[in-house]
Swiss-Prot record:
Gamma-carboxyglutamate residues are formed by vitamin K dependent carboxylation by GGCX. These residues are essential for the binding of calcium. Decarboxylation promotes the hormone activity. Belongs to the osteocalcin/matrix Gla protein family. InterPro entries: GLA-like_dom_SF (IPR035972), GLA_domain (IPR000294), Osteocalcin (IPR039176), Osteocalcin/MGP (IPR002384). Ca(2+) 3 binds at E24, D30. Its main location: secreted. It comes from the Eukaryota. Ca(2+) 2 binds at E21, E24. The modification Hydroxyproline is found at P9. This is Osteocalcin. The keyword Secreted applies. PROSITE patterns: GLA_1, GLA_2. One of its GO terms (cellular component) is extracellular region. It comes from Sus scrofa. The carboxylated form is one of the main organic components of the bone matrix, which constitutes 1-2% of the total bone protein. It acts as a negative regulator of bone formation and is required to limit bone formation without impairing bone resorption or mineralization. The carboxylated form binds strongly to apatite and calcium.
Length: 49
């Protein structure tokens, strides 16, 4: 058990996070992502994810 008083470690950076944010800002992409998943929705709107 290691507790250095720093809280939880930072999660590993998600390489898809910038694309996920782009999709979330587009209401149509965001809605589609709710149904088929972010990566497929992004691919349909913007090309290869």
């Amino acid at each position: 058990y290691l507790d250095h008083g720093l809280g939880a470690p930072a999660p590993y950076p998600d390489p898809l996070e910038p694309r996920r944010e782009v999709c979330e800002l587009n209401p149509d992409c965001d809605e589609l992502a709710d149904h088929i998943g972010f990566q497929e929705a992004y691919r349909r709107f913007y090309g290869i994810a």
